[in-house]
Regions:
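ATP-dependent carboxylate-amine ligase
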Residues: 1-136
């Protein structure tokens, strides 16, 4: 909640995109009410599969079940870090604020998104340069 509040304070007019990975099924179940309120104010939420640690899905709430109970308009479930990276790269628009939070390998998502966006920017510049100088 504090991270989202800080991002909204710092970037009040920007779209806020969050990728979240719950930590354990039992914790997702136990903290459901807090999860519902902590994501208020975001524009897009992606939820990765729960980082299970020592648990099985029978121990509580899965990421898909958590997603179904959240009252956020624009949400998506992704099965893997690579799927999350692809989804975020296709979703982000100039000026968006993107944050990955949670347990497990969700921290790999921003690090995977950054080079992909950099490559897209370089490709765009190359196309623009070619359009400006078609004889080179």
């Amino acid at each position: 909640k504090a991270t989202i509040a800080a991002a909204k304070t710092r970037y009040p007019d920007r779209r806020l995109v969050i990728c979240f990975q719950p930590h354990t099924y039992s914790r997702s179940s136990y903290l459901l009410d807090k999860f519902i309120s902590c994501f208020e104010g975001i524009d897009k939420l992606l939820i990765l599969d729960t980082f299970p640690a020592r648990e099985t899905e029978a121990d509580g709430l899965s990421a898909k079940e958590l997603l179904a109970r959240l009252e956020i308009k624009d949400t998506s479930h992704v099965d893997s870090v690579s799927e999350a990276i692809d989804h975020v790269v296709n979703l982000l628009e100039p000026g968006d604020v993107f944050i990955g939070v949670g347990a497990g390998d969700v921290t790999d998502v921003p690090w995977g998104v950054l080079p992909r966006l950099q490559n897209l920017a370089w490709e765009s510049l190359a196309v623009q340069k070619e359009e400006l100088n078609p004889n080179n």
